[in-house]
Amino acid sequence: MADDNNSNGAANPTLSILAQYTKDLSFENPGAPRSLQARDKAPTININVNVNANPLSDTDFDVVLSLNAEAKDGDKTVFHAELTYGGVFRVAGFPQEHMLPVLFIECPRMLFPFARQIIADVTRNGGFPPLMIDPIDFTQMFAQRVAEEQARAKVQAVPN
């Protein structure tokens, strides 16, 4: 008896990581060794996150997660960590309308724990407590990105 679960002939969706890599890593501690002394209050930490995806073939994609963490004490930079962490993913069998969510939500979600650990290690190795970045809501990030692109398209479509 034939398997009727796949009657349209499409392959079962698969998502696999073929490779992971650190593309760029930078850590700056401009005030060392003074920045390593005890302080009255914790520095303000700002974290920026970005995700990009580029096709390598019909099924393989390079997904890059960029994390930028900057700690400031007033107007002085305490430390600045930047990481560009990538993964080569094989994405096959998904309907076309699911490709962008897979690339911009699921792939970075798989990369994040590794990137988070690298940032924690580099801040610890820089003389500070490890910076443990809170989990990131990639679904919300993707929704915001789509909304911004739609708003930009509306502005460009309006005649002057």
Curated annotation (Swiss-Prot):
Keywords: Chaperone, Cytoplasm, Protein transport, Translocation, Transport. GO terms for biological process: protein folding; protein tetramerization; protein transport. GO terms for molecular function: unfolded protein binding. One of its GO terms (cellular component) is cytoplasm. Its main location: cytoplasm. It holds the Pfam family SecB. It is found in: Cytoplasm. Homotetramer, a dimer of dimers. One homotetramer interacts with 1 SecA dimer. One of the proteins required for the normal export of preproteins out of the cell cytoplasm. It is a molecular chaperone that binds to a subset of precursor proteins, maintaining them in a translocation-competent state. It also specifically binds to its receptor SecA. Belongs to the SecB family. This is Protein-export protein SecB. It comes from Rhizobium johnstonii (strain DSM 114642 / LMG 32736 / 3841) (Rhizobium leguminosarum bv. viciae). The gene is secB.
